């Protein structure tokens, strides 16, 4: 390390050892300004007698200071040297030689031998492409496959073949379903037909795919060309159709249903098959009723009683309390179980326990079940969701998604980013089994845009109430749907709830009567 006190030497050292030029030239201007200032300062500090000597030395020093170094250049390309003319000429010659290699010179020579016109014509013979023999040539694989599968061309359900998922396994979400075919003979009906469909297909598309595969496999009997003539029902593993539930909605996607076994059933909508239309028998019981589906009126009352007892949870024919059937219009008159439904001239009966009576009732006129009401009752078991507001104790509301099906009621909170939940308790999802539901009542209806209903259910041996609000149309639909589900299920919790409610009402009436008697 060196210590210098002479600014002139420092400036000279910077010029000789460093690059002081840039694109703007500002660095050189700064150094030159310092040189001028130092020169004036040095001349003013020197006595007059030595002025001549210092002028001579200053001239040498000034020349030394302003002398440019070899390393100082005017730009950053000081390390690049221009190519000489010889190098450029050699590069041009090299490119010309490469271009000459790509060219081929052909020397033209006159022919020594003479050829006739026929020989010359055979060299470039004209061919007629219009006259082509169609019998010659190899047959394509597509033509061979079309000849081997003549039914593929005549299949009326070809438009549904695009929903076949056998060629999409591993690449697209698919669903494998075993389908029982009710229209086949008794032996073929026992074996299901395996169908692989893409997951985003609808139920209507799956029905068309089943018909397409049925026709492709040349099964008998032949199907109706109309896909709307069929429907899909839930089936057991042994192929028995579960008639307790309605058919799957044709507009819903198939991935919404988690059933791996279904049954293809014909709707019997044509006038010629009206005799095969299913009938519904209403069986009234305590705090509810059941709808029994029968194929014809030739079924015995014993079979209807067994189906009605099977509907009741925990009730068996050979164990527990015994039951009998009575006509709704004829109380305390048991029905002959060996007789047929046709001989009863009624479709509404009452299920009564043995050695008991349902009381003296006034004979009622025989009521015919409305088919539209039956369809509403059956469709009530299908899943449907509603967006409502749940009312809490502090009267604040929470938006929830209310999902209702024949098995359970689900309450899922709807997350809203705009609503702050800092001061409120976060709503948790709630799932209520249908056997634990007790009641669903309309609590308040102020206007068509605002109504409130109450849901009562059993939880840990205690009855709890949930309040919801929405527009009047939605509330009425929810109340009607839940009540249809409650009436079609003989729930023990619902029966106990009404019994407890009746006891409270009786106790309240008795208390008020005694109070009036004392005051009187």
From Swiss-Prot:
Topology within the bilayer: Peripheral membrane protein
Sorted UniProt keywords: Cell membrane, Cytoplasm, Endoplasmic reticulum, Endosome, Golgi apparatus, Lysosome, Membrane, Mitochondrion, Mitochondrion outer membrane, Nucleus
Transmembrane segments: none
The organism's place on the tree of life at top rank: Eukaryota
Gene Ontology MF terms in the entry: enzyme-substrate adaptor activity; phosphatidylinositol-3,4,5-trisphosphate binding; phosphatidylinositol-4,5-bisphosphate binding
Family matches, as CDD domains: PH_Avo1 (cd13331)
Region (SIN1-type RBD) residue spans: 279-353
Main location as per UniProt: membrane
Residues annotated to bind a 1,2-diacyl-sn-glycero-3-phospho-(1D-myo-inositol-3,4,5-trisphosphate): 393, 428, 464
A single BP term in Gene Ontology: TORC2 signaling
Reported regulation of activity: Phosphatidylinositol 3,4,5-trisphosphate (PI(3,4,5)P3) promotes MTOR activation by relieving MAPKAP1/SIN1-mediated inhibition of MTOR that takes place in absence of PI(3,4,5)P3.
Region (Disordered): 310-333
GO cellular component term of the entry, any: mitochondrial outer membrane
Protein family (similarity comment): Belongs to the SIN1 family.
Name of this protein: Target of rapamycin complex 2 subunit MAPKAP1
């Amino acid at each position: 390390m060196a210590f210098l006190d002479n600014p002139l030497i420092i400036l000279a050292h910077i010029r000789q050892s460093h690059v002081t030029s840039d694109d703007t030239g500002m660095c050189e201007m700064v150094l030159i300004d310092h040189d001028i200032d130092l020169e004036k300062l040095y001349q003013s500090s020197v006595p007059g007698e030595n002025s001549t000597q210092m002028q001579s030395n200053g001239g040498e020093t000034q020349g030394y200071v302003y002398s440019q170094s070899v390393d100082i250049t005017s730009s950053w390309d000081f390390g690049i040297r221009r190519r000489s003319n010889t190098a450029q000429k050699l590069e041009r010659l090299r490119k010309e030689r490469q271009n000459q290699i790509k060219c081929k010179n052909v020397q033209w020579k006159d022919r020594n031998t003479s050829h006739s016109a026929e020989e010359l014509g055979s060299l470039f013979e004209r061919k007629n492409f219009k006259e082509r023999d169609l019998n010659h040539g190899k047959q394509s694989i597509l033509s061979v496959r079309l000849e081997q599968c003549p039914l593929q061309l005549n299949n009326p359900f070809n438009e549904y073949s695009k929903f076949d998922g056998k060629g999409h396994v591993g690449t697209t979400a698919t669903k494998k379903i075993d389908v029982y075919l009710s229209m086949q003979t008794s032996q073929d009906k026992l074996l299901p037909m395996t169908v692989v469909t893409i997951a985003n297909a609808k139920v209507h598309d799956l029905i068309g795919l089943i018909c397409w595969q049925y026709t492709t496999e040349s099964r008998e009997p032949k199907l109706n060309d109309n896909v709307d003539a069929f429907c899909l029902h839930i089936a057991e593993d042994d192929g028995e159709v579960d008639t307790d539930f309605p058919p799957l909605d044709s507009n819903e996607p198939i991935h919404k249903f988690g059933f791996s076994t279904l049954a293809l059933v014909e709707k019997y909508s044509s006038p010629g098959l009206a005799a095969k239309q299913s009938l519904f028998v209403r069986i009234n019981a305590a705090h509810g009723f059941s709808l029994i589906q029968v194929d014809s009126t030739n079924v015995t009352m014993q079979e209807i009683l067994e189906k009605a007892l099977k509907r009741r949870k925990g009730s068996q024919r050979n164990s527990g309390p015994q039951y009998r059937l009575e006509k709704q219009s004829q109380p305390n008159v048991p029905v002959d179980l060996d007789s047929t439904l046709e001989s009863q001239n009624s479709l509404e009966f009452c299920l009564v326990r043995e050695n008991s009576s349902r009381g003296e009732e006034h004979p009622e006129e025989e009521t015919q079940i409305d088919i539209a009401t039956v369809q509403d009752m059956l469709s009530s078991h299908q899943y449907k969701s509603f967006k409502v507001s749940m009312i809490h104790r502090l009267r604040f509301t929470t938006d929830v998604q209310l999902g209702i099906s024949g098995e359970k009621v689900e309450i899922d909170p709807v997350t809203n980013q705009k609503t702050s939940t800092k001061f409120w308790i976060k709503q948790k999802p709630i799932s209520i089994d249908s056997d634990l539901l007790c009641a669903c009542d309309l609590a308040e209806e102020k206007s068509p845009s605002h109504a409130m209903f109450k849901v009562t259910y059993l939880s840990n041996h205690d009855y709890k109430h949930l309040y919801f609000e929405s527009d009047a149309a939605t509330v009425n639909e929810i109340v009607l749907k839940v009540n249809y589900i409650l009436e079609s299920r003989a729930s023990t919790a619902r029966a106990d709830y009404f019994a407890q409610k009746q006891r409270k009402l009786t106790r309240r009436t008795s208390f008020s009567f005694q109070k009036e008697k004392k005051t009187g």
